Amino acid sequence: MKLNQNTMLVGKKVVLVPYTSEHVPRYHEWMKSEELRHLTASEQLTLQQEYEMQCSWCEDEDKCTFIVLDAEKWQAQPRPPEESCMVGDVNLFLTDLEDPTLGEIEVMIAEPSYRRQGLGTEASLLIMSYGVTKLGLTKFEAKIGQENEPSIRMFQKLHFKQVAMSNVFQEVTLRLAVSEPERKWILEQTSHMEERPYRTRKAEPVTATLSEQKSWNCPLPRPDGCMGDTSAVSSVCARLS
């Protein structure tokens, strides 16, 4: 989504940054896990397909995606590469054509050692606050596998209520209507959040040959963040996610 192309959200436990091609290799390693693919209802993709997917999400105006970083590690000095701070991702999907104020939320803490420490809760609250204040959302929905009890409990703690269950898809649907009291509660829970500009850093080479990259259905980005320069091999896919 172009709206958050230069936006980072800094919380106490997590930092949310736009999903760029710098993050793709580690994300690809995560999704080799059969457990994660099952919990997120995802298909296994090749590295090339992951880059193409990231590029397409850069342009899609109905997808707001952030990578979740460990705030403590990210704030260390000297600052480590973002890839080494990655712990998961969080998304808002604005795909209901009849109701543009509804956002479907997904959160994944991919690193097992970071689970059950409140990172998923804070990441969800940060993106919900962003959705309410920047995207005009008044309703949130989460679809979760029936066996994923930790995620169900987390969203219930965020005031979501179960509204449907599908035995066919083995999932439950939870929803939160953002009334004025709920909006106030969300903003209170995220009063510590800082919104900062996410500036393009010096491009780093991706781990693929030029011939491989030319076969991708995504124009190669220039180091300045503009699309289309096939002579540049960078890890920054226009920072349009």
From Swiss-Prot:
| Protein name in the entry | Alpha/beta-tubulin-N-acetyltransferase 9
Fetch the SUPFAM superfamilies from UniProt: Acyl-CoA N-acyltransferases (Nat) (SSF55729)
Q: Which domain of life is it from?
A: Eukaryota
Q: Which family does it belong to?
A: Belongs to the acetyltransferase family. GNAT subfamily.
Q: Recorded GO terms, molecular function?
A: tubulin N-terminal-methionine acetyltransferase activity
InterPro entries per UniProt: Acyl_CoA_acyltransferase (IPR016181), GNAT_dom (IPR000182), NAT9-like (IPR039135)
Q: Which reaction does it catalyse?
A: N-terminal L-methionyl-[tubulin] + acetyl-CoA = N-terminal N(alpha)-acetyl-L-methionyl-[tubulin] + CoA + H(+)
Every N-acetyltransferase domain range = 34-181
What does the record give as the function of this protein? N-acetyltransferase that mediates the acetylation of the N-terminal residues of alpha- and beta-tubulin.
Q: Which UniProt keywords apply?
A: Acyltransferase, Transferase
Q: Report the EC number(s), separated by commas if there are several.
A: 2.3.1.308
Q: Which Pfam families match?
A: Acetyltransf_3
Query: What's a GO cellular component annotated to this UniProt protein?
Result: protein-containing complex
